[in-house]
Structures are given as C-alpha cells and as structure tokens.
Amino acid sequence: MNWAFFFTSNVGRKIVMALTGFFLISFLILHVGLNSCIFYDLPFFDPNDNGSMFNRAAHFMGASFVIRLMEIFLFLGFIIHIIQGYVVEVKNRKLRGTSYERALGNRGSKWYSRSMAILGTLIFLFLIMHVSHFWVPSRITHTLDPVTYGNVETHNLFFKMYETFQNPIIVVLYVIGVISLAYHLFHGFHSAFRTMGVHNRKYLNMLKGLGYGFTLVICVLFALMPISMYLDWVSPY
C-alpha cells in the first residue's frame, strides 16, 4: 500500500480524523473527571474542602511522567485533527459544485453537520483561551499561588479557576466554547464510527444515541464549572 497516497487521500484523511477524534474523546473523559473534583466543595459533599481534592488531583496529574508524556501526544492529536479537518472541508467544498447542488445535497443534513469547520474554529479559539488561562501559568510560567497539603506544596489551581470565572465575559465565552464542542460532538461522535466502517443503521442509531448522551453529560459538566464558580456555588471561601 502507498501510505503517502493513503494519508493524503480524502478517505485516509477522514480515517486519521476519526482516530484522533477517538483519542481526543478519551481525553475529554479524563479531563472532565479531573475537573469535576471542584464539585466536592458543594454543600452536600464537603463545603470545607475549598478545592483540596481538585488541587491534589491536579498535582498528581502534573507530577505523573505518563500524563506529561500523554500531553505531547494530546497536542499532536489536536494539531493533526485540526489540520486534517480543514483540508477535508476545503476539498469537500471544491467537490460540491454549485450552490444549487450543495442545497440539494444538504437537504437531509443537520446544520451542525454542515458547520463542522466553523465549530472546530470556535473550539480552537476556546482552546487557546483555556490553555492561556490555566495550563500556561500552571506548567510553563509557574505563576500560581502555592498551597500545601500535608508536606506537599502544589499550585492552587482551584483559586485560579475561581478568580478567572469571576469575570462574566469569560464565563460567557467558556459556555459558548462548550456549546460549540457539544454540536461538534453531536455529529463527530457517530461519524467517526461510520468512517471506521460501521454502516449498519441499527448500530449507527445506537451510536447516535450514545453520542448524544455522552455529549450532554460531558458538556453540561464543563459548562457548570464556570457557572458554579461565578455564582459562588463552588468557591475557595
């Protein structure tokens, strides 16, 4: 097989997008699981936690060699997924022909399935904002306030989150980013399986339902994080 031709073909690019998409979905599960530790501060868990569970979990992840290695693959996965997505979108636009032909071909599709490139761009901009707010000061500049648990000193990332989400504009931008992610996943989740060879209507419908459920759980949790901190449901005080 000519691998160079395969990975530059439309089918090959879509397979690469599907595989990197699966990898990024697994990251979302890990990321939302870690960040959900902030909710341990809620009154029905431990209102005196003050971010302790989240900070200790974040410290463990940041100190793990395996996790740091995975971050490299994560960034590569994002870059490859984004580049391949734009290339496929440009090629598809060239193949669609006239606007009349596009209208005929898109009558049965959802608006978000036709807007994956736009949604992907919004997610990319959201990702830049998110990384600059938390990952850079935590991993690169080390400008976060310290906090000590037992004999272990770590970054007070919980306080940084709270401080960041006191700005209503940032909260709105984060919610927009999460909504963009939701619509991107609504189409991308089952489409990735279809690209990998699942064409049975019964299984595709099942995967669509699974994808919708997965997306709602992940994105509702992500959206609740800035909202709950802005409304002081979760706080370091």
Feature-to-residue mapping (PLM):
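Membrane-embedded alpha-helical bundles that constitute the cytochrome b-like, heme-associated redox core
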Residues: M1-Y237
